[in-house]
Amino acid sequence: MLLFTMGLLLAILQPSTGQFPRVCANTQSLLRKECCPPWEGDGSPCGERSNRGTCQRILLSQAPLGPQFPFSGVDDREDWPSVFYNRTCRCRGNFMGFNCGECKFGFSGQNCTERRLRTRRNIFQLTIREKDKFLAYLNLAKNIPSKDYVIATGTYAQMNNGSNPMFRNINVYDLFVWMHYYASRDTLLGGSNVWRDIDFAHEAPGFLPWHRAFLLLWEREIQKITGDENFTIPYWDWRDAEDCVICTDEYMGGQHPTNPNLLSPASFFSSWQ
């Protein structure tokens, strides 16, 4: 059902894979408030002819908001994604995605019935070749446009309630940077006024599962652009670390020798914008 940024814990229950599906970032979809694209396998909305899913009205939580957010109807992320769309694909079985064209995490195969076990490893236990491949995959994601998703450059009100779509292309890596920002940014109250005492991604019980789903989605997009179905994001076990031992030019980048706000020029990431 949910298909965009995971603004609420509800998105963990029915995962999404990005910000706004490109096929729904248009006037017709926004005015109809419907995002039920056809699955390319059979050409029907949500793959309905193949029993993958159906186009349904989204079900919103009726739970009251907490006192830390004393507003209603001012933030596009409220009751996400109902401000933009109130009908989306509800996928059946092990299918997921904005058109039910993906398999749920841990499944693969034509009908998403095959279990697939992937193992994440400590980044310090990777071989030099494995570590270099990981960095190369990140660099590819930074330089390849997202095929399926775009990001919003304005609020729904600025889009004139859908009649003036405001979206732009983005690369695969920055798509997830944007998703994280979009879910956690301040509430825009109009003009220069903002409400800072809110963070939909971090200051709530959904902190851990939100980031778990976020990383799974990021991992999946890198698998797709590289064709490497066995790719997993390595982890850094920092429990006993006294400083940032991963902040070296061999890994995530050391500090610039003269400017503490920049990465070392020898870092793989120093040329990123």
Curated annotation (Swiss-Prot):
Sorted UniProt keywords: Copper, Glycoprotein, Melanin biosynthesis, Membrane, Metal-binding, Monooxygenase, Oxidoreductase, Signal, Transmembrane
Note describing how the cofactor binds: Binds 2 copper ions per subunit.
Glycosylation sites: N86, N111, N161, N230
Binding site for Cu cation: H180, H202, H211
InterPro entries linked: Di-copper_centre_dom_sf (IPR008922), Tyrosinase/Hemocyanin (IPR050316), Tyrosinase_Cu-bd (IPR002227)
Membrane topology recorded in Swiss-Prot or TrEMBL: Single-pass type I membrane protein
Cofactor names: Cu(2+)
Catalytic function, reaction form: 2 L-dopa + O2 = 2 L-dopaquinone + 2 H2O; L-tyrosine + O2 = L-dopaquinone + H2O
GO molecular function: metal ion binding; tyrosinase activity
Subcellular location: Melanosome membrane; Melanosome
Enzyme class: oxidoreductase
Major subcellular site: membrane
Signal peptide: 1-18
Gene Ontology BP term (one): response to blue light
Enzyme Commission (EC) number: 1.14.18.1
GO CC annotations, alphabetized: melanosome; melanosome membrane
Similarity section: Belongs to the tyrosinase family.
Physiological role: This is a copper-containing oxidase that functions in the formation of pigments such as melanins and other polyphenolic compounds. Catalyzes the initial and rate limiting step in the cascade of reactions leading to melanin production from tyrosine. In addition to hydroxylating tyrosine to DOPA (3,4-dihydroxyphenylalanine), also catalyzes the oxidation of DOPA to DOPA-quinone, and possibly the oxidation of DHI (5,6-dihydroxyindole) to indole-5,6 quinone.
Protein name: Tyrosinase
Gene it is expressed from: TYR
